[in-house]
């Protein structure tokens, strides 16, 4: 294996035309340059430099190696510059994934804020439900993903680390003309006889949260239709097909022919996390994005509290 540092010495000898001039340029002694060239010749298995009355002359092998050395040293310089840029958030790439309701609320502000601070970092965002997002993270195809769980503690996981962002309470959606639409706060027990429109069981954590809440309220819901599109669910509710439970993150836009009602002080809640790989290198870009996500989520939760107090 050829030593890169010795190749740098050879390049200076070729540029300067003598060992002494190369030594001055590199801040070496002349004997150190001579030793480095001799060691490189042993590694190469051939003569690279010939001395003459005017200084030194490269052999054919020496000229060939200098050409490669120029390319190698240039690539190393590029690599060092790129690494410095990444460390200083002046370059690099960050791959994100988020489910639709977070992708329409938390992520736009987080990405805009991140780009305002670190415009040279390339960001990509892939829409994906929590389970596929975590799969991408495990496969090394994403750096930061947003995940939803049904419990306030993160799942036990040897590979994925989760940082809490916010608790996302769920609200009841009813048609405007519903008998309970006039009430600002409802108890889930009051809705025991309703028909329900829910997400697809198994693919949507909201369903398991709702079913568990119904069990605690003492009834089994009558689920008459399934959809994983929250805006479509609003349409089905408006059409009188039933009630639904919609998380706060999905209420960025609400139809005027439905009403959204609170389920009291302890509503069903899902929990939003920023997920990354455990024990993997945390790049400056990844750390910066986690900090931005925490900021945006805290502001979202604070604004939600302010609206609740004002209503």
Show which residues each predicted segment covers:
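Beta-alpha-beta core module
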Residues: 155-164, 168, 231-281
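Hydrophobic hinge/microswitch elements
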Residues: 129-142, 148, 202-259
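Central regulatory/effector-binding core of bacterial HTH transcription factors
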Residues: 91-154, 227
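Secondary-structure junction motif
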Residues: 148, 194-217, 282-291, 297-307
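Short helix-boundary/capping micro-motifs
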Residues: 12-29
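Acidic, Gly/Pro-rich loop/turn segments at junctions of secondary structure
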Residues: 117, 128-193, 249-255
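A short LG(V/I)-centered, amphipathic sequence patch enriched
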Residues: 19, 41-63
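C-terminal effector-binding regulatory domain of bacterial HTH transcription factors
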Residues: 2, 117, 248-257, 265-311
């Amino acid at each position: 294996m050829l030593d890169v540092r010795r190749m740098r010495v050879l390049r200076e000898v070729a540029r300067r035309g003598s060992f002494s001039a190369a030594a001055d340029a590199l801040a070496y002694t002349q004997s150190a340059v001579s030793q480095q060239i001799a060691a490189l010749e042993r590694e190469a298995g051939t003569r690279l430099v010939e001395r003459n009355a005017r200084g030194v002359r490269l052999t054919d092998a020496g000229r060939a190696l200098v050409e490669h050395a120029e390319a190698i040293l240039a690539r190393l310089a590029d690599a060092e510059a790129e690494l410095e840029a990444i460390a200083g958030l002046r370059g690099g790439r960050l791959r994100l994934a988020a489910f639709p309701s977070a992708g329409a609320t938390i992520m736009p502000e987080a990405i805009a804020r991140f780009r305002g601070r670190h415009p040279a970092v390339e960001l990509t965002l892939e829409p994906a439900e929590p389970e596929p997002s975590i799969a991408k993270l495990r496969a090394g195809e994403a750096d930061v993903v947003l995940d939803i769980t049904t419990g306030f503690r993160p799942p036990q996981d040897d590979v994925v680390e989760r940082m809490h962002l916010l608790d996302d309470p769920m609200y009841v959606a009813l048609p405007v003309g519903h008998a309970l639409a006039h009430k600002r706060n409802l108890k889930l027990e009051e809705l025991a006889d309703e028909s329900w429109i829910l997400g697809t069981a198994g693919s949507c954590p909201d369903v398991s949260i709702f079913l568990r809440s119904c069990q605690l309220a003492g009834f089994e819901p009558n689920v008459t239709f399934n959809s994983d599109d929250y805006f479509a669910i609003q349409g089905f509710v408006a059409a009188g097909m039933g009630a639904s439970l919609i998380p706060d993150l999905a209420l960025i836009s609400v139809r005027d022919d439905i009403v959204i009602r609170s389920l009291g002080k302890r509503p069903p809640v899902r929990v939003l996390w920023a997920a990354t790989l455990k024990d993997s290198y945390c790049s400056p870009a990844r750390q910066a994005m986690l900090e931005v996500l925490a900021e945006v989520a805290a502001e979202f939760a604070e604004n939600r509290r302010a609206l609740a107090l004002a209503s």
